[in-house]
Curated annotation (Swiss-Prot):
Species whose genome carries this gene: Oceanobacillus iheyensis (strain DSM 14371 / CIP 107618 / JCM 11309 / KCTC 3954 / HTE831)
Keywords: Ribonucleoprotein, Ribosomal protein, RNA-binding, rRNA-binding, tRNA-binding
Protein name from the UniProt record: Large ribosomal subunit protein uL16
Pfam families tied to this protein: Ribosomal_L16
PANTHER family noted in UniProt: 50S/60S RIBOSOMAL PROTEIN L16 (PTHR12220), LARGE RIBOSOMAL SUBUNIT PROTEIN UL16M (PTHR12220:SF13)
Length: 144
């Protein structure tokens, strides 16, 4: 399970999930990627489940990059506890994902295998996603 080694503060505000992703919107390491098309919190358990689904399908071939990291703690109060008396105890870790963010990248496998592996991974995630390919640098030109 992914989580930070140490944090300055144990509890954080929830924050807003407005707008598009600022960075990490292009396929940087691999050949194919899984891009979020809506905003959500993704827990460390969901990231791990998606990773396992991909690597199981690809057997031993290929390489996987996880481009998101759960660095935001979320809290929960125990069951049957009245409102008030402070914020709840830290329950787990989430990654804030906004539209356009590349969450996973794959290389070293064919496009069909990558497409199916990322489809299986997308079923483990609470966001709508799309399959993207790496844009070749200098592939198309507008000259002449």
């Amino acid at each position: 399970m992914l989580m930070p080694k140490r944090v300055k503060y144990r509890r954080q505000h929830r924050g807003k999930m407005r707008g598009q992703a600022k960075g990490g919107t292009t396929v940087a390491f691999g050949e194919y990627g899984l891009q979020a098309t809506e905003a959500s919190w993704i827990t460390s358990r969901q990231i791990e489940a998606a990773r396992i689904a991909m690597t199981r399908y690809m057997k031993r071939g290929g390489k996987v990059w996880i481009k998101i990291f759960p660095d935001k703690p979320y809290t929960a109060k125990p069951l049957e506890v009245r409102m008030g008396s402070g914020k709840g105890a830290p329950e787990g870790w989430v990654a804030v994902v906004k539209p356009g963010k590349i969450m996973f990248e794959i290389a070293g496998v064919s496009e069909e295998v990558a497409r199916e592996a990322l489809r299986l991974a997308s079923h483990k995630l609470p966001v709508k996603t799309k399959f993207v390919k790496r844009e070749e640098i200098g592939g198309e030109s507008n000259e002449g």
